[in-house]
């Protein structure tokens, strides 16, 4: 399963973002999925 917009993600181990999203780690300490459009 993948996670969507605003959900917590981890680029190195998952959970991974759904298609159309990328894992943004700017808002530490957690990474969150952002729309990549």
Curated annotation (Swiss-Prot):
GO MF term list: sodium channel inhibitor activity; toxin activity
Effect of residue 28 to A: 28-fold decrease in binding affinity and no change in lethal dose
Listed result of changing residue 8 to D: More than 80-fold decrease in binding affinity and 5-fold decrease in toxicity
Subcellular location: Secreted
Consequence recorded when altering residue 12 to F: 13.5-fold decrease in binding affinity and more than 8-fold decrease in toxicity
Site (May be involved in voltage sensor trapping upon activation of sodium channel) location in chain: 19
Residue numbers of Serine amide PTMs: 37
Biological processes per GO annotation: envenomation resulting in negative regulation of voltage-gated sodium channel activity in another organism
Impact upon substituting residue 30 to A: 58-fold decrease in binding affinity and 5.1-fold decrease in toxicity
UniProt keyword list: Amidation, Disulfide bond, Ion channel impairing toxin, Knottin, Neurotoxin, Secreted, Toxin, Voltage-gated sodium channel impairing toxin
Listed GO CC annotations: extracellular region
Top-rank lineage group of the source organism: Eukaryota
Positions of disulphide bridges: 2-18, 9-23, 17-33, 25-31
Function noted in UniProt: Insecticidal toxin. Binds to site 4 of insect voltage-gated sodium channel (Nav) and inhibits channel inactivation. In vivo, it lethal to lepidopteran larvae. Has no adverse affects when intracerebroventricularly injected in mice at a dose of 0.2 ug, but causes reversible paralysis of legs when injected intracerebroventricularly in mice at a dose of 2.0 ug.
Domains: entry comment: The presence of a 'disulfide through disulfide knot' structurally defines this protein as a knottin.
Protein family: Belongs to the neurotoxin 07 (Beta/delta-agtx) family. 02 (aga-3) subfamily.
Name of the molecule in the record: Delta-amaurobitoxin-Pl1b
Species assigned in the record: Pireneitega luctuosa (Tangled nest spider)
